[in-house]
Amino acid sequence: LRNPSLYELYGSDNYGIGGNTKLNPEKSETNELYGEYNFSETIKFTSTAYRAKVFDRIESNAAYSKHENELIDINQEGLESELLFSGNNQNVGLYTNFSKSRKANGQAQSRRPDLSYGANYSKKINSSIYGPFNLNLNYKHTGQFIDYDGSKNSRQKSTDLVDLSIKKNWFGNTLSINLTNLLNERYEKPATYSQDGRQLKVGFNKVY
């Protein structure tokens, strides 16, 4: 069960899509099959296959004037897998998501890519100069998807995003350096909404 968001109930955007206080919650039925296999104490593989059906889904109407509960159901199925390596104060995760989300009439659902994959890496480092600190590196590829670009539904480009973060405990406080969108990928998500390029952020979290 997913209740309508405040935006879907009361909001509006630059294209004139308005809210609708008469919306019903979205409903879904899901069947899952989960498997896990430990190759060793340091290597583990997990996988989940699923099939779902979504009723009363909330989307903008054909005139793009307001949000409505659609009469056409959504059928979803997919396979999510991850291979995990751990040891020597470091962890590596490789994952893939294959998904298919289609309306009952065969049309693709908006903003739902059929493929995404990536990798996560974390390591605890003990430097003779800076002492111990944690390093995290994350990569995610998101495949193409359908979205409304202001005039029609069009296929949006795939993206490759890399984030890097370094965190250090300093007298009970946390110092952090974060590099987001390391490859300076230029993209819109959702369509017509440009996302930030490469950014450097320095943080300090004090514990009282």
Identify the role of each PLM range.
Residues 31-33, 108-208:
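Conserved C-terminal beta-signal and adjacent last beta-strands/turns
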Residues 41-54, 60-62, 69-149, 203-205:
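Gram-negative outer-membrane beta-barrel transporters
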